Amino acid sequence: MIQYPEPLAKLIESYTKLPGIGQKTATRLAFYTLSMQEDDVTNFAKSLLSAKRDLHNCSICGNITEDDPCPICRDKTRDHSQILVVEQSQDVMAMERMHEYHGLYHVLHGVISPVAGTGPEDINITSLLKRLKKDDEVKEIIIATNASSDGELTAGYLAKLIKPAGIKVTRLAHGLSVGADIDYADEMTLFKAVQGRTEM
Amino acid sequence: MIQYPEPLAKLIESYTKLPGIGQKTATRLAFYTLSMQEDDVTNFAKSLLSAKRDLHNCSICGNITEDDPCPICRDKTRDHSQILVVEQSQDVMAMERMHEYHGLYHVLHGVISPVAGTGPEDINITSLLKRLKKDDEVKEIIIATNASSDGELTAGYLAKLIKPAGIKVTRLAHGLSVGADIDYADEMTLFKAVQGRTEM
């Protein structure tokens, strides 16, 4: 039986290493690559290498950055008294798209998860504590881990750890999404919405 | 608002150029790339460049190949009296996986499509006719374009063109898939199955 030519087989193999891409999709993508403009393919290859080579985690907040410290940590106009703690770099971008938060961030790169065997020492908590010790400007830690059980566990762990230092610890509100129908909301979300109701 | 660091933004842009990959998936893939082994990323970049640089269409059959002519056209043990005509290189691999066809191939790189404005001169037909003129070893052309309306149109066009030269032209059988239920088959497939019924 004839096999795919080696360069094509290797490209298919590379595509299958991406999440959610199986043999069929990888083959389709590889053939598509052959039909792409030469420039686009060259830029694709360059951007793969450059992303891997030029991006690092900020030594202060752990967010992905080209320069260390990252532009957010360096920005004197931002409110350095607030640190918002997120699970991953993508969450920083989600918060920034909101345009309404002007404090700093801290990226945990994971959550405490007994099921996955991830303990507090496996995520970026030590550097958060170091930050708080070094910098007494910080007045509030806003915990923005996801509303999953692991996210809640991590939030609880952090609160217990930080509160004794006299720093205010808050958690993002849970409740109905804006525009959501009550009869489509799940029980946990409804429970959180009732629990966190506000006076009008 | 903070933007993604440039190397990451460029990588996301490259991923969005692939078919079926939007902004969200591209972002997910780009972040995943950052977490990949350095070697895997380097190999990915290399295979992109190599696939684009080292692969060409065989000057005889049009199939994708590293060497020209391709291994199938060069293979003296294959039956050079049969040419199976397909729409795209992927179809050659599908036929080869069957292990039962030992003739040659011809890849059209498309079909005649009045809707898309693709005429006979836009696909790899001229080189097929040249092949037939030069090589009187060919006894049969098996047309294996898809069973779509464009595929049927192309098949009809080729048959009309080749038959006068005294070469046998055949078409792959259409009918029920092996293992298919009759009550789930569409009308056209059932019609083709009845039309092409064989004596037992």
Swiss-Prot record, chains A, B:
Domain Toprim: 81-177
Alphabetic keyword roster: DNA damage, DNA recombination, DNA repair, Metal-binding, Zinc, Zinc-finger
Keyword DNA damage part of the UniProt annotation: yes
Sample GO molecular function, one term: DNA binding
The keyword Zinc belongs to this UniProt entry's keyword annotation: yes
GO biological process: DNA recombination; DNA repair
Zn-finger region bounds: C4-type: 58-73
A Pfam family the protein falls into: RecR_ZnF
Family as reported in the entry's similarity comment: Belongs to the RecR family.
PANTHER family linked to this entry: RECOMBINATION PROTEIN RECR
Matches recorded under HAMAP family: RecR
Functional note: May play a role in DNA repair. It seems to be involved in an RecBC-independent recombinational process of DNA repair. It may act with RecF and RecO.
Protein name as annotated: Recombination protein RecR
Native species: Limosilactobacillus reuteri (strain DSM 20016)
Gene: recR
